[in-house]
Regions:
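Surface/interface-facing alpha-helical segments and adjacent flexible terminal/loop regions used
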Residues: 1-36, 41-45
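A short glycine-rich, His/Asp/Glu-containing loop-to-beta-strand
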Residues: 36-57, 68-76
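Short, intrinsically disordered, charge-balanced linker/junction segments flanking boundaries
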Residues: 57, 137-139
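Short loop/turn motifs at secondary-structure junctions and domain boundaries
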Residues: 63-66
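Short alpha-helix capping/helix-loop boundary micro-motifs
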Residues: 68, 106-111
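Glycine- and acidic-residue-biased ligand/ion/polar-headgroup-sensing regions
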Residues: 68-70, 74-84, 89, 97-102
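A short hydrophobic beta-strand segment most commonly corresponding to one strand
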Residues: 72, 121-123, 139
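Conserved metal-binding segment of the jelly-roll/cupin
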Residues: 114-135
Length: 139
């Protein structure tokens, strides 16, 4: 897992090429003015999915992971908590949606949380389970 902010001005050269490409796309596009939908960056290999979503209570958000794709979460506005833990292979799968490369889990253990603000990004690898769109701990 990688957590940082586009606003930090960090060089993306330290990351693999696919992550560099995704982060440069985040940095160079105004997501607030984009319509929800899928935007191809490098065909089906690298793409952005724009959502207009509200955060929910942690109990209403399912932990998830992906087998094929990395998942780069980027917050445009508001606040969000992201849950995360390592995929030990011991968690019971609740639902597998192969065409979306999406695995939902019934529950996970040792889940940590990070607070995300506008401009923050988090890269989740197939070895990471994550729980996006959780209501922030701040009022």
């Amino acid at each position: 897992m990688i957590f940082s902010s586009i606003k930090n001005g960090d060089s993306f050269e330290k990351y693999p090429a696919a992550i560099q490409t995704a982060l440069e796309y985040l940095k160079s596009h105004d997501f607030a003015s984009m319509e929800p939908g899928v935007y191809e960056i490098q065909g089906k290999d690298i793409y952005a999915q724009v959502f207009d979503a509200m955060t929910e209570d942690v109990a209403d958000r399912r932990p998830e992971s992906h087998e094929k794709y990395l998942d780069v979460q980027f917050l445009v506005s508001g606040r969000e908590r992201l849950g995360f833990t390592k995929n030990t292979g011991n968690y019971k799968v609740a639902e597998y949606i192969k065409e979306r490369d999406l695995i939902f889990y019934e529950s996970v253990e040792d889940e940590g949380y990070i607070e995300s603000r506008p401009g923050c990004f988090c890269v989740f690898f197939p070895s990471d389970i994550h729980r996006p769109q959780v209501i922030s701990g701040e009022a």
